[in-house]
Amino acid sequence: MLKKSLVVLLSMTTLASCGGGNSETQTPIESGFAMCSVPDQNAVFFEFLQNTYLWYDQLPASIDPEAYNSVNAMLDDVRFEQDRFSGFSEKQAFDDFFENATFVGFGFSSDSASDPNAYIVRYVFGGSAAEQAGLARGDRLTNINGFSIAQIADQQLSNETVFGPNEEGFTIAVTFTKPDNTVVNTQMSKSAVGTNTVFATQVIPSNAGSVGYLSFQNGFIEPSDDELIAAFAELATQNVDELILDLRYNPGGRVSVAGNLASFISGSVADGEVFTTLEYNDKNADRDFTVSFSDRINALDLTRVVILTTSSTCSASELIINGLAPHMDVVTVGSATCGKPVGQSPDEYCDMVLSAINFRTVNSLGEGDYFDGLPATCSVEDQIVADWGSLDDPVLAAAVDYLNTGSCGLQAAGKSLLSITPPPKLHYQALLTEHLH
């Protein structure tokens, strides 16, 4: 089964990572092992790495393909120490995320780190079982199928033990508390979840004029373009003067989607100018290419944008910040981003997809290499206490306050260390797969 070129990605979820553009077909070597056996895959994928890996000169000269019991073990052994982003996924899982935008589950993402007694809901996919059960951002899950959240942590229960197998129809009982302290007891059943990436589009009145708010999470994927077209049509109709773009939980994805989003924001301000350049290793310098801002119907023609960030703001999301910065005033509110100024052009072989780092990204000024993340202009701790667009959200409230006053204000005071402390060096796959149910 020959490898075929897939999309170029800047990020991933369960799977791939970030990138975007020009791909070339590589022909797998004849490894001498049974086709698609583990040693064969190890040999073929290592050969791909030797050719296209950004840090190919840091690889060992050769490997013993029989020394590893999986392609993941091989990659973990040979990867460059700075690389926490390259990874493998099964092709079906890759396609489900980037192309089909589906998974089997209840349809929500949660944060389990900020409260020992609750899973706090980050976002809920439209039309999912979670939405039908009344779950929304800011709700606190306190009991899942008879397990308290403290029990889950104390007993180190697996995701499958708590939420069940990834099978349609599997049902659990849940208890959750709304922000107004209403307690809900209900059931949810797993189904095929169609994932959306635009979670809210609205207008917030302010002293700075009409402020558009766009919550864009969960990736820069195939359906995103149509969602963004609809969102910016709505914002343009409202004649917004400013934009707050919420990228707090967006791990990235297609460079092409990032280019379209940036063009919607800047419009005539940067039309035809360089958004980003993808630079491959010296063996593949002929694959370097530049993505420019393009003319978009309903573009906002802004000279300033405020972007909400966390350490889960990654890859293509960071590309938006870095790519817009030479052309307009970019204000970030929240905390430092994840630090992924590199991307992948995935390679497929034997129904496995290798998303290895192939290129770095730089803006029109040649700026990149932000492996410690992009610092926040105004540092504010992310607290999930309300639904999208609510000014009870301290990060959104700080962003609106910045537009009203031109400064970070008291809410962000005393938190400046957040802007210079690098985010945790989580492996990228862990960052993208955690807490999606």
Residue map of PLM features:
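P-loop NTPase catalytic core of nucleic-acid-dependent motor ATPases
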Residues: 245
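C-terminal "post-core" interaction segments
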Residues: 211-214, 218, 226-230, 234-242, ...
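Bacterial N-terminal signal peptides that target proteins for export
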Residues: 1-6
